[in-house]
A protein has these predicted regions:
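Ferredoxin-type iron-sulfur electron-transfer modules in oxidoreductases and energy-metabolism complexes
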Residues: 282-311, 321-322, 326-439
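Intrinsic disorder at enzyme termini
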Residues: 5-35, 45, 403-404, 408-471
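The feature marks the mature, well-folded catalytic cores of soluble enzymes
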Residues: 1-307
Length: 471
């Protein structure tokens, strides 16, 4: 990491380092190729995948465009069963509420299932600084926690790691014997985590959906860890972004299979659970307290932008990451933010500031694969263009303005264009000397790329000869 580097400089440094690791890139591509095959097979289970996308988009459109109404309906029905709701306008409020609750209840040990919102507000750091013992129970998140790294991908947190690396990590951190078996590595983590479920005083989860009609949250998973995290501790806290709301329970009949298909290439994930409040009288399991923290954290800023509001429809399936040529080459950590890939590049400037994070909008080939892959039809690649436009409109860079002004002058004056075409071979001949001098204005580009040789003859020469020949 570069000390005191801006997000953009850090991004360029991390992206350059990752792209230089060719074996790692090949490993990621192979993993994602397997995902694509499973995804296509699962899509075939739908009578009409495109119709399903339209229907899913309509559900999310209704939820987001009537957000206040549906969130209040959820709160009424959830609190009627003894649950508590806290509205957090920003990350610090959410952290303070959860920290305060843990202190008041004498909590010592906390178990967590996967929640990207907790990564977003740096909840683990805040809890650990206060002396709480925090353990991630999702296998991928647990591995990343042992490595002291953030998730690489918001569905596959440790997809960049090979078995021998995970084995070495477990040997170092957990004292286990080396193993090349995925099953044995999973059992090593399982044995460690089982004890933590039993001793945890608080369980923290996220939610895939908030159901307004029933006042419940929905969690979908493949490991069963979320069920243990939410059922065994006395206190359950769900930290959820406000955009996760959907109007009706029946909506999940479409959204859960869509999420599984787009996210992991499954028809349906293994465990799909609904949570509607603390343990009721006569029930033998479940938490004694259930708190839902509804997190804004600049989501309403994006909601106010009618042009890009549909970015809030995202169901965090990760499909856009899996097909993105940029993500496949630079990896998840290069983005420097909780939400990676194309959708992360759209929403992060809204959440964390356009000028500091505008560079992410340039981390795209604009091929449109992300938009095609999105199960809720978010127009992702056009939103990246909108972010670029808005960044320029908000604060024009004089160097970029000068560059494009010169380009316009060149392209609108035939004599200037012809002169530039004549001088291009000379400029290319001189360029290596300029590179060696350390004063190359194009160094960031030419360090890893070569310009194609200027054509000889030029297109203009060719066209004039063609006309002269009467063709």
């Amino acid at each position: 990491m570069i000390d005191d580097a801006s997000p953009e400089l850090q991004f360029h440094a991390d992206a350059a380092r990752t792209t230089a690791d060719v074996p790692r890139r090949a490993f990621i591509r192979k993993a994602l190729h397997g995902y694509e095959a499973k995804r296509d097979e699962s899509r075939a289970a739908f009578a009409d995948w495109q119709h399903a996308r339209h229907a899913a988009a309509a559900i999310k459109y209704e939820g987001v465009n009537r957000l206040d109404e549906y969130l209040q309906e959820f709160e009424r029905k959830f609190t009627a069963r003894g649950g508590e709701v806290f509205w957090a306008s920003h990350g610090a409020q959410a952290r303070d509420y959860i920290l305060g609750l843990a202190r008041e209840r004498g909590v010592k040990s906390i178990i967590k299932s996967k929640t990207m919102t907790s990564e977003e507000i740096h909840l683990n750091d805040a809890l650990e600084k206060e002396g709480f013992n925090v353990v991630e129970s999702d296998l991928g998140e647990f591995i990343q926690q042992l490595k002291h790294e953030t998730p690489y991908h918001f569905v596959f947190p440790c997809m960049h790691l090979k078995r021998d690396e995970i084995s070495a990590l477990f040997e170092k951190e957990l004292g286990s014997a080396p193993s090349d078996s995925p099953e044995e590595l999973t059992m090593i983590a399982r044995r460690f985590l089982r004890r933590r479920y039993i001793t945890a005083d608080m369980g923290i989860s996220g939610a895939n959906f908030i159901v307004a009609e029933t006042g419940m949250i929905s969690i979908t998973e493949n490991e069963g860890n979320a069920r243990l995290t939410t059922a065994m501790p006395k206190i359950h806290v769900a930290l959820v972004g406000i955009e996760k709301v959907v109007p009706r329970l029946a909506d999940l009949a479409l959204l859960l299979p869509m999420l599984a298909t787009a996210g992991t290439g499954q028809n349906l994930t293994c465990y799909n659970s609904m949570y509607g409040g603390p343990r009721q009288k006569g029930e033998i399991d479940g938490p004694e307290e259930f708190h839902v923290v509804l997190l804004d954290n600049h989501r309403t800023r994006l909601l106010a932008d009618a042009e890009q509001r549909d970015a809030l429809h995202c169901i965090r399936c990760g499909a856009c990451l899996n097909v993105c040529p940029i993500f496949k080459n630079i990896g998840g950590h290069a983005y420097g933010t909780t939400y990676q890939g194309p959708i992360g590049s759209v929403i992060t400037p809204h959440f964390r500031g356009l000028q500091d994070w505008k560079h992410l909008s340039g981390a795209s080939s604009l091929c449109g694969a992300c938009t095609e892959a999105c199960p809720v039809k978010i127009d992702i690649h056009h939103h990246l263009l909108h972010n670029r436009r808005n960044a320029v409109a908000q604060k024009k860079d004089w160097r970029e303005r000068l560059l494009w002004s010169g380009f316009v002058q060149l392209m609108t004056r035939p004599w200037a264009y012809r002169l530039a075409a004549r001088l291009a071979p000379l400029a290319q001949w001189l360029h290596p000397f300029l590179q060696d001098s350390g004063f190359d204005p194009l160094a960031a580009w030419t360090k890893t790329r070569e310009f194609p040789q200027a054509a000889a003859p030029t297109f203009g020469d060719y066209w004039r000869r063609r006309k002269g020949a009467g063709r």
